[in-house]
């Protein structure tokens, strides 16, 4: 049995290093649903999904992380948002043709990576860094180095499993306030770098870890499910509508007869007719919900 759509945390007993392993298939497919992305964009979204899952698992508080790539290339934006419950959503915006063999930098052009950490309670933090590195994993590792965080390495794979898109990855991180040996960390990095896509996608986590670290003492903790979950709702759309000037809303109604608000993340449509809009301004959004 494989470990699709689960995140696993593990700890090396003899080293000051922690690890994570995640694979996603159903969640990945749901991110791709309702969109006709070019192959390199699909791959990048899979990598972003894995990276965001691994990063949110490092949070010591309730909240979410958004990893966003943006630039002036044919791929204007690619973003994944996830929280400490491993609830993920994501979207990409393509503005011109992308060749099947396009690299990260060819897609993004001159761009940056924006990482936003938003605790449920407390201050929001945002880091903006140049895209240094040929791959997403290398760019994220550069982010960790620049922000003087704990030594961290990521290993990300994408492909297919049982005819479905699949992505997986691993993270190694030195434990805080530990006198770790750099050679020990490098040793574990070399072992982890040998992980194959088919192992991540097709084997249980304990077997993957045994194949990689069979000479090490590793503690594997209970897994956490990874799911696709969009936070859109009719109420959120109503709240957004009510902030617009009344004249603009009236113009939209006059033009189309109703206002159709579309969620890029999940594809849901929220339709407001004239009566719905009138109810917004009287403080009653009503109970009916139209989804198409």
Curated annotation (Swiss-Prot):
<dbReference type="Pfam" id="PF01430">
    <property type="entry name" value="HSP33"/>
</dbReference>
<keyword id="KW-0676">Redox-active center</keyword>
<dbReference type="GO" id="GO:0051082">
    <property type="term" value="F:unfolded protein binding"/>
</dbReference>
<dbReference type="GO" id="GO:0005737">
    <property type="term" value="C:cytoplasm"/>
</dbReference>
<keyword id="KW-1015">Disulfide bond</keyword>
<protein>
    <recommendedName>
        <fullName>33 kDa chaperonin</fullName>
    </recommendedName>
</protein>
<dbReference type="InterPro" id="IPR000397">
    <property type="entry name" value="Heat_shock_Hsp33"/>
</dbReference>
<comment type="function">
    <text>Redox regulated molecular chaperone. Protects both thermally unfolding and oxidatively damaged proteins from irreversible aggregation. Plays an important role in the bacterial defense system toward oxidative stress.</text>
</comment>
<dbReference type="InterPro" id="IPR016153">
    <property type="entry name" value="Heat_shock_Hsp33_N"/>
</dbReference>
<comment type="similarity">
    <text>Belongs to the HSP33 family.</text>
</comment>
<keyword id="KW-0143">Chaperone</keyword>
<keyword id="KW-0862">Zinc</keyword>
<dbReference type="InterPro" id="IPR023212">
    <property type="entry name" value="Hsp33_helix_hairpin_bin_dom_sf"/>
</dbReference>
<feature type="disulfide bond" description="Redox-active">
    <location>
        <begin position="230"/>
        <end position="232"/>
    </location>
</feature>
<dbReference type="GO" id="GO:0042026">
    <property type="term" value="P:protein refolding"/>
</dbReference>
<dbReference type="GO" id="GO:0044183">
    <property type="term" value="F:protein folding chaperone"/>
</dbReference>
<feature type="disulfide bond" description="Redox-active">
    <location>
        <begin position="263"/>
        <end position="266"/>
    </location>
</feature>
<dbReference type="InterPro" id="IPR016154">
    <property type="entry name" value="Heat_shock_Hsp33_C"/>
</dbReference>
<keyword id="KW-0963">Cytoplasm</keyword>
